[in-house]
């Protein structure tokens, strides 16, 4: 069951944490898949298609799960997705009552199904057939055998597969969990993917950190909320659904306090809290990936399970192609359109009233104009009190915000409070005073300066300005002239009308275009042929993979370091906010708590976004464009040089931007 109605509630109350994604966009990722829900999906899909019968072999054993699992595994491998299947083991004691209830419900469904068959009631048959499906231990074992023959890792959980999947996600073995049970979120998996193994439904991505931020709940409160919604490890309160559960948690903070106020009892909730907090999992140090056993797979499918040879040959051909080709990181998945908001059908029909979940606080630095100049959008909309967490609720930073280059440090936007002030405010006119959110560097603790002060940033990656809107014509001319002068390349008159073949993230590219323009008259047919046949020659997929991995590692280490110091940053933000409010109220000694929370959250959010904005998806494209441009230039320079002369690197240095050291511009290298 998972958590009853959770996904439907999140789609209404925190839609920003849910999106629809394509399988193609997951290329290059490793995903832990809850095997039990996947096998159930495969079996029920086939049984629903035929109303009653499953696929079976000559011994009468079901093979529906084998057919579905094999096809889906091959599809995932073809897309460059690395699945890890996790199987349930002995269920925890806290789940015994739930399992007993499920057994009774299944027996009732079997009786109802028999009656529906006798009456030839197709709608009733369709309704009850899914409720009678059960994955046996023998089917589990055959699924494990199949996966090992295919070469897909199999992990047997200590108890619950969802908990083991979440453990793998926390330890960095996988990037997401594929399951239909939402309790993987309660077990602290960062990203949940629903419908991953369904063939006719879009994949739904749920971000835990964003959900907690939008709901304004700590993870402990989120756990209590999910227990009240209904979970597998204890009962729930009568008449309490997701809407009521959320309002109760927001009002009282915990189940124990709710029970105290309502004078009710909830048997087993403490055991459920403990199990969600510290589930029994198998300690994993490595995940071994092996080659597919083609001969063994053929024997298993044809001899043991009576698959047709023709069908098996086609499946094995697809598998070998998927396993033999190198997993390439899809540029489309890097720089494609953002995920669509998910259209989730709620599991309950009562509309949610009185729930005002917070919206995402807009970034102070979220875009650049078309001409490449930094824009500072107006920020006169301060989030409402419901949108601001208290100081002790530190927002998690598991998802890097997608924002553009920060504006100059001396051009930080100001904020105007437009909400109704507290009654203790002495003069209503003071609401209109604008106070800058920037803080003097000298007031920032030394250990926090590298997070808050732009000039103290320690870049792990730098982005070279390469776009047409980022470079002036004089700068481009100077760079190309310097390159040609260093290597003695006879440059001709630039042809501004030269048509350069190119597409993708590398273009438009004024540096490459200018270099090709001045070398177009050289008697070098090979160079001209390169221009015609390739827009990004000189860089292999291996090199591109390394660049991407370098960017990801830099992002992950930056996020990890921010999270480590987040409590101290919040404390400092609170101190700065208090000082700003005092200034705003002309020295008043009172500090309205609502404004303190609002300003603390605002400062923290802006500092975080400015520190991490360099790792957004659009920044990745700019990073790759700069690095690939250098490699392509080196290749083309070498084509212009005589035998025995080689260019290994460009005769250029970089200088950091005066506004942000993460961004650099190329300059001629002195002495070259």
Curated annotation (Swiss-Prot):
Renumbered to this chain, region (Disordered) spans 361-436
The cross-references to InterPro entries, in alphabetical order and at most eight, read: 5-3_exonuclease, 5-3_exonuclease_C_sf, Flap_endonuc, HhH2, PIN-like_dom_sf, XPG-I_dom, XPG/Rad2, XPG_DNA_repair_N
Q: How is it modified after translation?
A: Phosphorylated. Phosphorylation upon DNA damage induces relocalization to the nuclear plasma.
Q: Where is the composition biased (Basic and acidic residues)?
A: 370-382
Residues covered by region (Interaction with PCNA): 327-335
Where do the record's region annotations for I-domain lie?
124-252
Keyword Transcription regulation listed? no
Which residues are listed for Mg(2+) 1 binding in this entry?
34, 88, 160, 162
> Which residues participate in Mg(2+) 2 binding?
181, 183, 232
Q: Does the keyword Mitochondrion apply?
A: yes
Q: Which cofactor is essential here?
A: Mg(2+)
Enzyme Commission number(s): 3.1.-.-
Provide a GO CC annotation, any one: nucleoplasm
Tell me the keywords, alphabetical order.
Answer: DNA damage, DNA repair, DNA replication, Endonuclease, Exonuclease, Hydrolase, Magnesium, Metal-binding, Mitochondrion, Nuclease, Nucleus, Phosphoprotein
Single GO BP term: DNA replication, removal of RNA primer
Q: Where does DNA bind?
A: 47, 72, 160, 230, 232
Complexes and interactors: Interacts with PCNA. Three molecules of FEN1 bind to one PCNA trimer with each molecule binding to one PCNA monomer. PCNA stimulates the nuclease activity without altering cleavage specificity.
For this protein, the record's PANTHER family field holds: FLAP ENDONUCLEASE 1, FLAP ENDONUCLEASE FAMILY MEMBER
User: What family does this chain come from, according to its entry?
Assistant: Belongs to the XPG/RAD2 endonuclease family. FEN1 subfamily.
Its recorded name reads Flap endonuclease 1
Native organism is Babesia bovis
Q: What is the lineage of its organism?
A: Eukaryota, Sar, Alveolata, Apicomplexa, Aconoidasida
Q: Which gene encodes it?
A: FEN1
